[in-house]
Amino acid sequence: MKGYSEDLYILAFDHRGTITKGLLGVEGREPTQDEANKVSELKQIIFDGFLKANESGITGGDPAILVDETFGLEVQQKAKELNIKFAAPVEKSGQKVFDFEYGDQFREKINEIGADFVKILVRWNPDDEEEIRETQGNRIKELSDWLSENDKKFLLEFLVPATEEQLA
C-alpha cells in the first residue's frame, strides 16, 4: 500500500526564517553562529516537551515530529536514536516559488537525513502566473516521482495566499 495508513500526530517545528526573523530580528543575512545556536536550543526545548508528552502516552495514532536540519540536526539524530518518526522539509525557507533547499543535490540530502517522511511547503494559487504554476508543478512532480521510486513518504503542505483581487 502506498501512503501511510495510520493516524499521524505531527508536532511541526521546522520553522527557519520565521524564527530567525520573528524572534531574533535576523533579516537579509544569515544568522550568526550564536543566533543559530539559540534557535537550535529552542528546537531542543520543543523536542523535550514532545518527549515528555510522548512518555505520558499518546493514543489513537503515531506521534511524530517535523523538524529542519538547519537548526534541528541534533533533534533529528536523537529522534532516529529513539525510533521516533520524523519528517524533514526539503524546500527553501521563505520562498514565494517552491525550490529545493539543496538544489539538485536534494536526492542525496534526503538519503543522508533518513527521515520517515519528506515534506515540502508550496505557496500555490490557481490565479498565479502560468509560468510560476508550471515551474512549481514540475518541481513537485520531480520530487514526487523520485520519492515514489525510492519508497519514501511524502507530505505536501499547500499555502494558498489570496491575491488582492480575490480579497476585494
Task: Report the location of each language-model feature.
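Conserved anion-binding
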Residues: 124-128, 136-168
